[in-house]
Structures are given as structure tokens and as C-alpha cells.
Amino acid sequence: MKLHYCLCILLVVTFVPTALVLEDVTPLGTNQSSYNASFLSSFELSAGSYSGDDVIIAKEGTNVSLECLLTVDHYGEVHWYNSKGRQLHSRGGKWLVSDNFLNITSVAFDDRGLYTCIITSPTRASYSVTLRVIFTSGDMSVYYMVVCLIAFTITLILNVTRLCLMSTHLRKTEKAINEFFRTEGAEKLQKAFEIAKRIPIITSAKTLELAKVTQFKTMEFARYIEELARSVPLPPLILNCRAFVEEMFEAVRVDDPDDMGERIKERPALDAQSGIYVINPELGRSNSPGGDSDDGSLSEQGQEIAVQVSVHLQSETKSIGTDSQDSSHFSPPSDPASAEGSTHHRE
């Protein structure tokens, strides 16, 4: 906040209590005039009384003179009436009528109101004057003045304290900005954060320059953190994780789940399918030497042999083949003559 704004606030706070104290006072018109007529020495218009067109304002306890502005005959009489309609006589005391003036001694707050003067010659006419009295006595007025004075004092102290705090804040902010432009490296970013807390008081030019420098330093800090993260040593397995996973998938090929399901369903059916196949008796014997040496076997009729066949998967077939090869290596064939004898015995 600028200094002249603070001064305006101080002026407003200074004059508001005064206006509240004088709230019963009506501003006078532009045609204010003072009556220089010759009054009695004891009823001269006091310094606390003011006169306007038809309004007279006086403080409580002062003497007031009201003038009737009607043209009065030399032998005519003027009659004065108060706001209650009671005629005021000049028999001494508080009221005193002299020619066309009404003099009031020690005006009280109850004397306020409209006063009317009436003449009967040369013509009947009337003229009214309003009297307003400023209430200055009593406990309430003193209490009100004390309250206003205390409020004004507190407000003034708060405003002065605020000005001092703002001045201190501005000095600290200026010092922080100067230190920001003098520092380099990581400390400059820290100074930028300190200045950011005081942003509302910074001028526009310095704010723009500070924003540019802060943005550049923030990006530089981000790059520094990124390089620092890359320089941290990590295990080779974590660094080569993607290559390791790709090699693993190439080594172990995963089939389609749908095809695997179909194969699992077909496997029991293949295992269950078994049948008896008849060998054609017209098939000739093999061209083995053993067959040619056996002349009697050519004249014999063929016989049907029942063979049970089962279907296995490729992997099972390979395992069976391996087992049969192993057994053939460890069990050599028997004597040909004994083999032929057993054949004839079965026939």
C-alpha cells in the first residue's frame, strides 16, 4: 500500500469521530449572515450561536437572541410563541422580549424547537425561527466522547504499527532481492523461495525479472536432478531388465491358449480309440533269407493274427522309441534255430 493511501486513512479516522460528535449540527446554508443589530448588552449573540436563513444553532448554556424580520410599526407590539404554542412574556427570568428580539438566557436542551413572532399592525403577519441546541451536558455525552477518543487512539496506534511493519517488510524484501541477484547456483533457488513469500510487496519490474530467473533456475535444477538420478549405480539386472525379459520370451515360446485347450480335449479321445486290424493273408513273405530257406512255409495257408493298436502323441512316441532302442542294445537276439523252432511250435 502506498504512503498517500495510508495518510488518507489517517485523515478519515481523524475526522469521523468529530463528525459523529457533531451529528446534531446541521450544515448552514450558503446565505449565512450574522446579525449586527443593536442588542441589549446582556443578550448579545454569543460566539457559540449561529444564525442561518430560518435556523439558529446554539450550544447548551449560552445566551441566544431571536430576531423577528417583520416590519414593525413604531407603536406596534410583537408577540412570541414557542413550539408548544405558549406565549412568552418579558417579565424577567429566562425570556426577555425587546422590540422585535427574543432573548433567551442559558439555553437548555429542552428549549429547542420552533419560535414564532406575530404582529398585528399595520397588518397581521407571522415569522418563524427554528432553534437547535447542541447537547453538551450529561453523563452520556462524556461517555460518548471518551469512547470516541479511545477508538480514535486505538485506530491511530494500529495504523502507525501497520506503517512500521510495512516499512520493515519492504526493507527485508529489498534485501532478499539484492541477495538473490548476488548468489549463484543452488543457493539462488533457495533465495527465490524466500522472496516468493514476500510477493505481494514486490514491484512489477522486479517481479517480472524474478519470474524469468526463477523459471530458468527451476528448469536447471530439474535437469540437475535428472542427471543425478542417471548417475546413481543400479544392478545390471535392473538396467537390462527389458532385454532379459525379451530373451526369456524368445527361449520359451508360449502357445496359443485356445490351441492348447483343443489339444487337451482331443487327447482322451485319441487314447480311447483302439481297434483290431486284420493283416491280409495274401501278403507275401518278406525277402529275408530265413524265409526263402523255409520251403514248407510257402505251401501253408495264411492265418489271421489279432494285433491291438494304440495312438500316442509325438512326445510319447519318442520316449517309447528311446526305451525300445535301449532295450535292444542290452538284449542281443537269440539263436536263429531256436527262433525258428519256437515259430513252428506256435503254428
Curated annotation (Swiss-Prot):
Alphabetical UniProt keywords: Cell membrane, Disulfide bond, Glycoprotein, Immunoglobulin domain, Membrane, Signal, Transmembrane, Transmembrane helix
Signal peptide location: 1-22
Positions in the Cytoplasmic compartment: 161-347
Region (Disordered): 280-347
Post-translational modification: Glycosylated.
Gene Ontology, cellular component aspect: plasma membrane
Main localization (coarse): membrane
Matching SUPFAM superfamilies: Immunoglobulin
Chain positions carrying an annotated carbohydrate: 31, 36, 63, 103
Domain Ig-like C2-type: 47-130
Subcellular location: Cell membrane
Spans within the Extracellular topological domain: 23-139
Transmembrane parts of this sequence: 140-160
Topology in the lipid bilayer: Single-pass type I membrane protein
Residue stretches of biased makeup (Polar residues): 311-331
Positions of disulphide bridges: 68-117
PANTHER family the record matches: MICROFIBRIL-ASSOCIATED GLYCOPROTEIN 3
Function text: Component of the elastin-associated microfibrils.
Name of this chain's protein: Microfibril-associated glycoprotein 3
Naturally occurring in which organism (per UniProt): Rattus norvegicus (Rat)
